[in-house]
C-alpha cells in the first residue's frame, strides 16, 4: 500500500479506483437491482486471478460485493436471524483464533472477508431487491456461463486463460485440467469442480425466474449440459439434486406442463449424459477411483483437528505451499474447515447445515435455500475454491434474507379486542389552540 501511494502512477490508479467505486455505489443506491448485475458479472465473467493488491488482494468480485453492501445497507431493515448469530459466532471464533495466534492471517482473511462479505452482500441484496429480480438476473448470467462452457467443450478453447491481469493466482488456476483425454470445461471459474457446483446452484433460480417457459427450459438444458462437460461428479450430482429439488419443492413456481417437460428432459438428458461421461471416466482409468480414494483417506486427518484454531500438523514451506500432514491439498470443505479453524466452528456450521435440510422440508421454500441444500452433500468432496466460495455464501445470505422477509409477511396479526382507542390529538389540528 505504501508503495502504491508513494508513486504518482500508483496514486492515480488509487484515485481512479475510488472514483469508480463511488459512481458504482451511487448508481446501485438509485437502482438496487444493478448491484445484483454487478456482482453476477464479476462472479461469472472475471477469472479468480484478476485483481489488484492494496495491502490485500482485491478482486472485482470482492469490490462489487463491498460496493453493494455500502450502497444498500441503509434501508435494508435486517433483523437478526438464527443463522446470522451462528455465522457471527463462527467468524468471531476465527477472529479470536487469529488474535491468539492459532489461526493464520491467510485463513482468517479467507473466512472473515471471503465468507463474511459474500454472506452480507446476499443478506442485504435479498432485503432490498425482490426475489424475482434476483432470480432472473442469476438465470440470465448462468445462461451465459453455460453457453460459454458448452462452446469451450466443443472448441477446446477457454478464452479466459488469455487474461493474465492480476496476481500470482494465474499459475495456480489458469491451467485446464483433463479427464480421460478430454479437457474439462472451467469457464472463468479456474476449476471444473467450482464451475459444476455453481451451475448446480443456479438451477433453482432459473426455475423461479421471470423468464418465459421456453427460455427457462432452454437455460435449464444448457446448464445441465454444461455441468456434464465439466466431467465433475460433484457438479453433475448436485445439478441432478437441484433439478429434483425444484420438481418436488418448488413445483408451485411453474405450471404442471412445465414440470412434465422438465421431467422428460431430465430422463432424456440422463440417457445422453451417461454414455458420454462413462466413456470419459472409463478412459480416465484409475484417475477417478484414485480421486475418490484420496477423499476417503482425508478422514485420517480428523483426529488431528484442534478444538479451536489450526491443526498442529499444518506446515508451510518457503514457497508458501501449505501441507496438512502428508496431504498437499484438502478437497473437502468440512475437513479443511476443521483443520484450519477447529472443531467448534465446524460443529456450528454442521448444525446449521442440518437445520437447512429441516427448513427446506418444513418451512416456506425459496430458490436460494434449495440451491444451498443441493450442494451441501458435495461439500464433502470439494473445498471452498475460487468464485464457488462467493456463490455459496451469497446464496446462503439470500436464503436467510428470504426467511427474514417471509417471517414478516406471514407474522400473525393480533387484533385489538378492547374498547376503541382515540388517537392522540395534535395541537392546532385535532383540538383548538388555547385562547390567551
What are these regions (language model features)?
Residues 67, 371-376, 385-436:
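Transmembrane alpha-helices of multi-pass inner-membrane enzymes
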Residues 244, 248, 259, 340-376:
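Hydrophobic transmembrane alpha-helices and their immediate junctions
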Residues 35-42, 359-383, 388:
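Loop-to-helix entry and N-terminal half of a specific, functionally important transmembrane alpha helix
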Residues 278-341, 356:
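Long extracytoplasmic/lumenal interhelical loops at the membrane interface
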Residues 20-25, 67-77, 94-149, 352, ...:
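Transmembrane alpha-helical segments and their membrane-water interfaces
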Residues 33-51, 60-116, 373-378, 431, ...:
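N-terminal hydrophobic segments of proteins, predominantly signal-anchor/transmembrane helices
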Residues 147-157, 247-287, 303-305, 435:
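A membrane-periplasm/extracellular boundary helix in multi-pass inner-membrane enzymes
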Residues 21-22, 136-160, 172-230, 238-248:
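Alpha-helical transmembrane segments of multi-pass inner-membrane proteins
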Amino acid at each position: 500500500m505504501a508503495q502504491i501511494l508513494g508513486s504518482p502512477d500508483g496514486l492515480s490508479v488509487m484515485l481512479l479506483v475510488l472514483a469508480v467505486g463511488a459512481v458504482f455505489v451511487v448508481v446501485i443506491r438509485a437502482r438496487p437491482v444493478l448491484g445484483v448485475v454487478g456482482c453476477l458479472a464479476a462472479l461469472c465473467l472475471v477469472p479468480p486471478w484478476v485483481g489488484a493488491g492494496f495491502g490485500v488482494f482485491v478482486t472485482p468480485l470482492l469490490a462489487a460485493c463491498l460496493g453493494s453492501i455500502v450502497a444498500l445497507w441503509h434501508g435494508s431493515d435486517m433483523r437478526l436471524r438464527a443463522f446470522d448469530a451462528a455465522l457471527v459466532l463462527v467468524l468471531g471464533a476465527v477472529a479470536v483464533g487469529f488474535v491468539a495466534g492459532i489461526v493464520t492471517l491467510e485463513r482468517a482473511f479467507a473466512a472473515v472477508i471471503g465468507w463474511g462479505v459474500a454472506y452480507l452482500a446476499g443478506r442485504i441484496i435479498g432485503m432490498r431487491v425482490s426475489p424475482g429480480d434476483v432470480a432472473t438476473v442469476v438465470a440470465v448470467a448462468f445462461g451465459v456461463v453455460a453457453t460459454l462452457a458448452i462452446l469451450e467443450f466443443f472448441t477446446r478453447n477457454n478464452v479466459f486463460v488469455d487474461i493474465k491481469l492480476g496476481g500470482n493466482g494465474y499459475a495456480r488456476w489458469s491451467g485446464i485440467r483433463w479427464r480421460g483425454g478430454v479437457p474439462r470445461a472451467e469457464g472463468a471459474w479456474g476449476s471444473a469442480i467450482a464451475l459444476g457446483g455453481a451451475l448446480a446452484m443456479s438451477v433453482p433460480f432459473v426455475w423461479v425466474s421471470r423468464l418465459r417457459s421456453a427460455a427457462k427450459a432452454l437455460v435449464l438444458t444448457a446448464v445441465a449440459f454444461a455441468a456434464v462437460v465439466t466431467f465433475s461428479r460433484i457438479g453433475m450430482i448436485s445439478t441432478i439434486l437441484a433439478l429434483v429439488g425444484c420438481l418436488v419443492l418448488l413445483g408451485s413456481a411453474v405450471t404442471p406442463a412445465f414440470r412434465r417437460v422438465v421431467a422428460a428432459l431430465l430422463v432424456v438428458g440422463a440417457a445422453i449424459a451417461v454414455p458420454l461421461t462413462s466413456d470419459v471416466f472409463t478412459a480416465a482409468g484409475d484417475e477417478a477411483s484414485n480421486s475418490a480414494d484420496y477423499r476417503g483417506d482425508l478422514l485420517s486427518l480428523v483426529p488431528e483437528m484442534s478444538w479451536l484454531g489450526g491443526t498442529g500438523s499444518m506446515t508451510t514451506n518457503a514457497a508458501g505451499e501449505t501441507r496438512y500432514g502428508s496431504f498437499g491439498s484438502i478437497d473437502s470443505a468440512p475437513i479443511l474447515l476443521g483443520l484450519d479453524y477447529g472443531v467448534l466452528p465446524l460443529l456450528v456450521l454442521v448444525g446449521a447445515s442440518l437445520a437447512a435440510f429441516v427448513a427446506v422440508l418444513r418451512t416456506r421454500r425459496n430458490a436460494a435455500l434449495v440451491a444451498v441444500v443441493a450442494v451441501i452433500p458435495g461439500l464433502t468432496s470439494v473445498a471452498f475454491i475460487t468464485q464457488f466460495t462467493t456463490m455459496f455464501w451469497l446464496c446462503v445470505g439470500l436464503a436467510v434474507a428470504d426467511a427474514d422477509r417471509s417471517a414478516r409477511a406471514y407474522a400473525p396479526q393480533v387484533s385489538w379486542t378492547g374498547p376503541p382507542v382515540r388517537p392522540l390529538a395534535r395541537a392546532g389540528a385535532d383540538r383548538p389552540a388555547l385562547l390567551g
